[in-house]
Design a protein with these regions (language model features):
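Catalytic His-Asp segment of secreted/periplasmic serine-dependent ester chemistry enzymes
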Residues: 123-203
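Solvent-exposed loop/turn segments at secondary-structure junctions
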Residues: 24-27, 54-59, 83-88, 123-127, ...
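Active-site segments of SGNH/GDSL-like serine hydrolases
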Residues: 80-84, 107-139
Length: 203
């Protein structure tokens, strides 16, 4: 799907550049190295994932970070920006969150017209971290709708987490919101490799 762009050396394709744009689920996610390794093996070219992400931040913050994403000149942008919008103590209204993600997507499409943009839903929330996000699914749906309205891709990782037994899920996400990096690598990275490179690659 992505052809190797030569940089003057016949056997040295340029790296595929990815920006992961999001919250602590990206900043602390730990799944990026596995994505780099898996996608590089699949595409037979280097892959570099850079994160523009900050724990505890919302889509309001993300609006101020679009310049950083654009400056990286990525080929692909992975976006998850709903999780903290939905918290009761940092409450960004559903309408405001939807407007913010729409504005972010419009800016990225205008300024990076060749980039492939993928909006993501990450993992399920539980315990206290879930209780303070009672309408999280509505925020995911709003961000999905804004992506699809623009013809952009949406990847939902939640069903893959929910295939785990309740005990395994609790072990994988001990605080109810942040998966252990090794589990995130096993669940998120392969799904992104398949989506980016095509189902004929990977496992």
């Amino acid at each position: 799907m992505f052809s190797a762009v030569k940089n003057g050396h016949a056997d040295s394709p340029q790296p595929l550049k990815i920006v992961a744009f999001g919250t602590s689920l990206t900043a602390r996610g730990g799944w990026q190295p596995a994505l780099e390794t898996g996608l590089s093996a699949c595409l037979q070219r280097p892959v570099k994932v850079e994160s523009v992400a900050k724990s505890g931040e919302t889509s309001q913050w993300a609006l101020t970070q679009v310049d950083r994403v654009v400056a990286a000149q990525p080929d692909i942008i992975l976006i998850e920006l709903y999780a903290n919008d939905a918290t009761l103590h940092r409450f960004v209204s559903l309408a405001q969150s939807r407007k913010n993600i729409g504005d972010i997507l419009d800016q990225l499409r205008q300024r990076l017209p060749q980039a492939r943009i993928i909006v993501m839903a990450m993992n399920p929330f539980s315990g206290l971290r879930g209780l303070i996000r009672p309408f999280a699914d509505s925020y995911v749906s709003a961000h999905q709708a804004e992506a699809e309205k623009r013809g952009l891709e949406f990847v939902d990782h939640r069903p893959h987490w929910e295939r785990l037994t309740p005990d395994d899920l609790a072990t994988a996400i001990p605080d109810g919101v942040h998966p252990l990096p090794d589990m995130a690598s096993k669940i998120i990275a392969p799904e992104l490799v398949k989506r980016i490179a095509g189902n004929n690659c990977g496992e």
